[in-house]
Amino acid sequence: MGNNKGHCYTWNESIAKRGPNEISSCLLDFIKKQLKNGVKKIIFYSDNCGGQNRNRFVFSMFAYASKTFGIQILHRFLERGHTQNEGDSMHAVIESAKKRQSSIFTPDQWIMLIKMAKVTGQPYDVKEMSQKDFYNFNDITLTKNWATDASGKKFMISKVKQIEFLSSQPSNRN
């Protein structure tokens, strides 16, 4: 069950890029945090940004995490143009807080702004990523068959609306 707590991951561009390995690394960190709370099923909702959310790097990391930690992971993609997710709301709150600041000069100031952006409720949980927090998921991505799905049909990653990984069958794709 969710706790309505927003989680933010930050790093500057001298530390890492903003590609699928970086996003997968943040998601893996989030999954590990949830395991400490006894969570066995995690459901992610995200937009259709293929470069960050809907790609074989993220999916390979989910398969790895599902098998390694014995958990179920479900990732649902929102319909383009029909929904607004919690991430959009969080970004709006952070942007609003930024407008109230005269200037921001350092990454530390950004982190403090993000932590304090939410006026009511729990503040956002902010993790400042370091180089050691990022992984390269290329090797595990290469071990998967991305050409066909479990039933042998052509796998169109851009058409995926939902994908589920079970610890007993980490390669299942819906």
Language-model-detected regions and their locations in the chain:
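Extended mixed-charge, aromatic/glycine-enriched low-complexity segments
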Residues: 1-174
